[in-house]
A protein has these predicted regions:
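N-terminal nucleic-acid-engaging modules of covalent nucleotidyltransferase systems
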Residues: 1-88
């Protein structure tokens, strides 16, 4: 399964360059590593348009949650997608 940190890293690389070819390379590399079943979730998260549609949850609601931070990155794209399913 694809780790969320992989998606974030690719998004950071895309945002950090003005080179269209570098953007394409970063996205192509990311999508080539994704399982075919993860592609809709990956694309939705990259576009800030999750496949679940508008959730009506903003930064204020998320920041109010009392959740401990993980010692190391552990979330997968699939787990984030499932959590968004539960909110939808």
């Amino acid at each position: 399964p694809m780790m969320l940190t992989e998606l974030v890293s690719a998004a950071d690389r895309v945002g950090a360059t003005s080179s269209r070819l570098a953007k394409i390379d970063a996205l192509a590399e990311l999508l080539s590593r994704a399982d075919p079943t993860e592609i809709p979730a990956v694309v939705g998260l990259l576009l800030a348009a999750p496949r679940q549609g508008r959730l009506g949850v903003g930064w204020r609601g998320i920041s109010a949650l009392d959740i401990a931070h993980a010692d190391s990155p552990a979330l997968t794209v699939g787990e984030v997608d499932q959590a968004l399913d539960a909110l939808a």
